[in-house]
């Protein structure tokens, strides 16, 4: 009998020990779950009236921007209620609250609206409110945005904030409350109408209580063409090369590099990157500058400028010319970077002859080049060039689905020297997104589409928007000329000035550029330093382009006529990116 009693005692003690351990583990692992259940069970003190804002996903369904639940202490004021009593009750729950701030919270907004007394409660504070069972105080759930990949592309995704004073009238007229949060930048602003959802509708009763008429409807989800894994890979490449560059001479002004990768047949952007070097350990994401910051792009735009020669029958491609320099009256001579021998149009692209482009510009002005000649030009010649450049997407708004896109600077002065500069990409400035639009249009043989980030929008799983990638314009140029540009660009990347910039296995085509740029290094409003900026734009494979790539590195070196060392960061970045693409192709073939 004693053995039985002893066994029973041991069994009971063991049972309660195991049960205690189980409850401890359950509480630890499922604390938030049971907290939510507790709130649900005590629903009389819970109010959820705002719709969930739509989320943002990448092309593979990876969550990029989501919603994080926030618990708040709230109160709903009754008619003729003494606010002093409400403040005292609030201080009983949280003595650390400032009474003046509680009064301010109670007096915000309309009388029938819930008043937020304390924001962002911890789980412990929520339990404290629920266990104290305060009269008429309740837990109000709200949500704030969270970014799955930190600051990566955050300026592209945009921000959500309260309505600003200057936009107050617009939003109030469109059904918003003054206290609502709205998208104020990036995709959040561009697609506000889809992301915001529909608020719950209530009837305000005579006693200031609310009766639900219709529940809230969550916002729609954006699905981007972006591949976040590729974005992260490209960021790593840019950072690595900026660190390497800063160890080399003449790179004190090199801090930024931009990359955009897309599908030229649709304009879908699969990676958009911008990194600014602060030191070897710290960088800042400046991806949005791809659509707002402009630079002289240099020879990379010669696919568009040589099109002027084709369209206006200024090129006899059965005839070769001897590369040299152009010397106009009273002006310094202008040359290619070296003497390049005899050239036709394809060889001129391959070796990036400035002289060949100068001859086209002079012919456009109705003259044949003679050394020391006087050349008269008008707005007409500049307009012809700029209209051709614009037909490719340079010097105009591209229409990318982001707010506040800016175009580069369009020069206002008209002179023979500047016309020659315009012909080689050394006058007007363009943004990286304009450069992408140009190379995509070229790769599509004249079909211009707007670059885009969102390919689909879903609401509760149903597709409510599908990007159809409309052709916005066709460049007025025949197929035979595109074939010649393609041949020239193919030669650039395989035999010419761009040799080694892109992995040969991808069968690439493209163009490089080096341009003069200028800096105000002491911020006194005056240009004091000349630099060189480096660019490249290409696509692959040449026979049926699937991908396009642009790389822009402003102020990469001193403007020293290439007599000193230049770290060609665009070469290294574009090569590593295309090596990565080649490795993906090899892996897919192995599978």
Each predicted region: which residue ranges?
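Beta-lactam-recognizing serine transpeptidase/beta-lactamase-like catalytic domain environment
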Residues: 63-65, 201-213, 226, 251-298, ...
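Charged, low-complexity surface patches
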Residues: 50, 118, 298-299, 378
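Periplasmic/cell-envelope proteins involved in peptidoglycan metabolism and beta-lactam response
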Residues: 1-282, 389, 521-523, 559-591
């Amino acid at each position: 009998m004693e053995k039985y009693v002893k066994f029973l005692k041991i069994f009971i003690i063991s049972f309660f020990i195991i049960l205690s351990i189980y409850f401890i583990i359950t509480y630890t692992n499922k604390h938030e779950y049971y907290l939510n259940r507790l709130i649900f069970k005590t629903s009389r003190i819970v109010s959820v009236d705002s719709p969930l804002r739509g989320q943002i996903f990448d092309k593979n369904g990876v969550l990029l921007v989501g919603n994080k639940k926030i618990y708040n202490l709230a109160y709903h004021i009754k008619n003729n209620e003494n606010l002093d009593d409400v403040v005292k009750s609030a201080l009983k729950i949280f003595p650390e609250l400032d009474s003046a701030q509680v009064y301010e919270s109670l007096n915000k907004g309309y009388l029938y609206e819930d008043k937020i007394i304390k924001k962002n409660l911890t789980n412990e504070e929520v339990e404290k409110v629920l266990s104290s069972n305060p009269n008429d105080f309740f837990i109000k759930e709200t949500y704030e945005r969270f970014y799955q990949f930190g600051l990566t592309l955050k300026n592209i995704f945009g921000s959500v904030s309260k309505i600003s004073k200057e936009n107050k009238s617009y939003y109030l007229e469109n059904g918003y409350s003054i206290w609502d949060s709205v998208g104020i930048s990036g995709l959040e602003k561009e697609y506000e109408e889809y992301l915001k959802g529909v608020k719950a509708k209530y009837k305000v009763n005579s006693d200031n209580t609310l009766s639900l008429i219709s529940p809230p409807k969550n916002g729609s989800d954006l699905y981007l063409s972006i591949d976040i894994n590729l974005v992260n890979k490209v960021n790593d490449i840019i950072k690595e090369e900026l660190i390497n560059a800063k160890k080399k001479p003449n790179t004190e002004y090199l801090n930024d590099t931009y990359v955009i990768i897309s599908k030229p047949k649709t304009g879908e952007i699969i990676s958009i990157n911008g990194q600014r070097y602060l030191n070897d350990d710290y960088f800042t994401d400046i991806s949005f500058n791809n659509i707002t910051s402009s630079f002289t792009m240099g020879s990379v735009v010669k696919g568009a400028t040589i099109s002027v020669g084709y369209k206006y029958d200024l090129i006899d491609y059965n005839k070769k010319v001897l590369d040299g320099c152009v010397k106009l009256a009273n002006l310094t001579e202008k040359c290619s970077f070296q003497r390049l021998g005899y050239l036709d149009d394809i060889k001129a692209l391959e070796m990036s002859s400035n002289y060949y482009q100068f001859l086209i510009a002079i012919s456009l002005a109705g003259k044949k080049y003679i050394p020391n000649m006087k050349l008269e030009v008008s707005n007409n010649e500049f307009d012809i060039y700029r209209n051709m450049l614009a037909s490719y997407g340079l010097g105009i708004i591209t229409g990318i689905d982001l707010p506040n896109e800016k175009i580069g600077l369009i020069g206002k002065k008209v002179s023979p020297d500047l016309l020659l500069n315009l012909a080689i990409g050394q006058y007007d400035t363009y943004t990286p997104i304009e450069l992408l639009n140009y190379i995509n249009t070229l790769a599509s043989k004249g079909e211009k589409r707007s670059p885009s980030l969102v390919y689909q929008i879903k609401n509760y799983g149903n597709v409510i928007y599908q990007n159809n990638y409309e052709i916005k314009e066709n460049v007025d140029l025949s197929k035979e000329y595109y074939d010649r540009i393609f041949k020239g660009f193919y030669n650039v990347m395989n035999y010419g000035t761009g040799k080694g910039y892109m992995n040969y296995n991808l069968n690439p085509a493209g163009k490089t550029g080096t341009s003069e740029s200028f800096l105000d290094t002491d911020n006194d409003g005056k240009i004091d330093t000349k630099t060189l900026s480096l660019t490249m734009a290409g696509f692959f494979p040449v026979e049926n382009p699937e991908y396009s790539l642009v790389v822009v590195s402003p102020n990469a070196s001193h403007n020293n006529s290439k007599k000193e060392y230049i770290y060609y960061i665009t070469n290294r970045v574009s090569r590593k990116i295309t090596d990565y693409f080649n490795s993906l192709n090899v892996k897919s073939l192995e599978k």
